[in-house]
């Protein structure tokens, strides 16, 4: 379900049922989707798919939530003539005047911050986290309904597009027991990816798997090949987890989609490159898990520069999750104007626009510190078009006072408590609205 969890009744719900034929011959599948109950009156979709051996297909429908307020479940039923398979997902729809539910539904979770400068106040703490500490942190996120976990990256490699990195000589260090490359990050946890997923399974949460880092802003053919190999390994190792929700491409991009190239020809080439990357990566991931969405985070600057490319890109990118609306350059359009432009192009493409809310501010030395809760609440109320709001990030910015380890400064606890108070007030407002 896109988006999952709690949503407003002002959006459309994207429902996808993915099927992979693991048999040796062509197979016919009867596929049905139901709302709440498995009966004819609750049927959303009923179709037949013929899928060749080792191939995949997906059933996809979008339905408005206007009259669906309340807690519901969506049932997928698949029959191959011999066996019947069922999957059920729950959804909560709240009454609202706007698309946003005005709360943070999840957060980035960097296993080690990519920048020692930015992560100055927590990298030494996060390094000490064991697998059990990661499980504890996932429970803390669940406590404040941040039920979507975006793993920032599964390899650490500090390089930018234009570096001479290749698939074969890639020097990055893995956060998990990868068989692709020997390098390992020097952290206490043995397999934090498994710890995060297994705990998220128990809590009914969703994990967006960060396929990266090859090199920042790099969507070249070399980067594409690396991403395919890593995505395949991640799916083979962790795809059995119920919480494995999506593939997230870690590389990020500027809002202009041209990598800030001043030369018109180079700018055009970068735009062609990013579209080709996601076209190929989407096709590759669909063969593994056809229902899984793919997400990219872009910044909100220079959005008008990319408007000639977004329609084509969004054919292959399910979720666009931009950041930086609160710090737009003076020469750019406003954050609200950028959000409205992106919402329009996503609506036209039947793609999803989520919000990567920045829960941090920069110190003079460029280290990050928790943003005051009042500023976060301001953003939650200002940008009301986003169907789902995630934040950057949980570790080092929020800290549950009941956790056995503190990652970062003491004021991270204040932000956790402040957000918890806001959440209680929001729930009360929603209850009285009913």
Predicted regions and their residues:
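Short, surface-exposed loop/turn segments at beta-strand-coil junctions that are enriched for proline
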Residues: 64-69
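Aromatic-lined carbohydrate-binding/catalytic grooves of carbohydrate-active enzymes
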Residues: 144-187
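Substrate-binding cleft of secreted/luminal carbohydrate-active enzymes
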Residues: 149, 245, 324-331, 348-433
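Catalytic domains of carbohydrate-active enzymes, especially glycoside hydrolases
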Residues: 107, 126-159, 313-320, 383-389
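An acidic-aromatic substrate-binding cleft motif
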Residues: 90-126
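Aromatic-lined carbohydrate-recognition surfaces of secreted/lumenal glycan-active proteins
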Residues: 205-226, 246-252, 271, 277-307, ...
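An active-site-proximal structural segment forming one wall of the substrate-binding cleft
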Residues: 130, 137-140, 187-203, 220-246, ...
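Active-site cleft segment of glycoside hydrolase catalytic domains centered on the general acid/base Glu
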Residues: 217-289, 329-337, 366-374, 400-411
